[in-house]
Every structure is written in C-alpha cells, then in structure tokens.
Amino acid sequence: KNVLLKYPLFNDSFQYLSAFRFGPQKTYNRDTSLVVNKKQISKVMGQCEYAIHFLEHYKNTNIPINDLAIKTEGEDLIDYRLLSQVELWLQKISPNIKIKIETIGEDFKLKYRFNREKNTITEDMSALNTGFGITYVLPILISILSAKEDSIILIENPEAHIHPKGQAILMELIARAVSLGVQIVIETHSDHIINGSLVALKNKIINPDHLAIFYFNRDENKHVAVSHSLEITNNGHIKRPPKGFFDQID
C-alpha cells in the first residue's frame, strides 16, 4: 500500500521527495528496474532511497536543461554531466566538497572529500561522519538537475537540515529550473524559502505566472485546514498577509 509507482503520475517526468527522505546511510540499495526503466529515485512514499543509485547510474549523462549548468571555478568549459553539476551546486552549499560513490556488491557507499589549501584534499569520509544536511539535500539537487522541461517535482521541506545561506542557494536553483520549464511544488515552513521565491520574482528570474503561494492554517472551531491564496506584487511583496504568516518577529 506504500508503493506509489502503480499510479500513472510516477513516470520519468515526475519525482516526489517527502520530508521523510533518507539521510546518511552506511550503504544504499540498488533497484535497476526503478532507476533505469522508470527513472525514479523513490519507491516508498518519496523517501529517495535510490537517489544514490540514480546518481551513480546517470553520473556521466548530460543534464537535460543546459542552462542549469554552472562552471567549475577557473574553467572555461562547462561539464554538463549529472555528477559534475550535482557536485558543483552542492559546493555552493558546502564549499570544497567532492562526491565519491563506491560500488559494494549490489549496494553503494556514499563518501565525501574536501579540497584544502595548497591543492591538497582530505581523506574519504563516510556520509555518516559529515553534516546531515549535505546528504539530505542531494536528492533535491539530483531531481532538479536530471529533470526535463515540463517535468513535475514535489518537494516537502527542502529547507530541512540546511543553513539559511544554503536555503537561498537552493532557491536560486529552483527558481532557475522553474524559469526553464520545470514545475516545482514546495511545502515549506521556512521564511528563507519563501523569501527566496520572492527575491527570484523581484530579480525577474521568474515571472508572476511562475509563482503562487498558499498559506494553510487551522479553523479552530471546525478543526479543518483552511487555505489562503496570497496576493504577490511584481516586486516580490506579499500584500495583506494573513495573521500567523511568518509574523512572529512583528
């Protein structure tokens, strides 16, 4: 009953990333049918349990949307391969990081290294021994950078375990993907994620048709959720925000 793949929506143009994503693990499993045939990173309730297999399998495949690619610092040419671009965007969140995936029988081990001064590099570190947010954000980067135009991605709590600057960088990637034809639906409790979308609108990375924000609160009498569609100006301001909408600092 927890397998969602039987629904037509779950195809190679769709990914669902739940708040209950896999964090750092000792090893990650393989599912060739899921990853190769269906191009999915999750099998059970959006847990992204096959994201590392996906990244390993498609690591040398160029990303579908070239304009999402960024350069390695100091290089003139862009490496469009998926692993390279995931690593480069991850470096914007966690500087100097390098990704290493080892095949162990039918499983995979995820490790990281970090560039240091004087062209030296640290020893390999297990994902278990690095910051939780590094591994937690990987499925988001993988999903967006492997997405085709007109794909749909649902992401719960993209801010989880990521510091505010990292959230802003993540929203930069999300906004760029949206502007290039990827539909991304986010559930968030972070003002940095909200503000990132508004900044993207103000800076004309996205246009007003690309952004809609809904706020949900609870009707205390009926004990049901009530949604509010927020009015957003072209300059990235929310007009007349409802009571309770990130107003704790007022």
Question: Where are these predicted regions, by residue range?
Answer:
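Walker B catalytic motif
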Residues: I155-P158
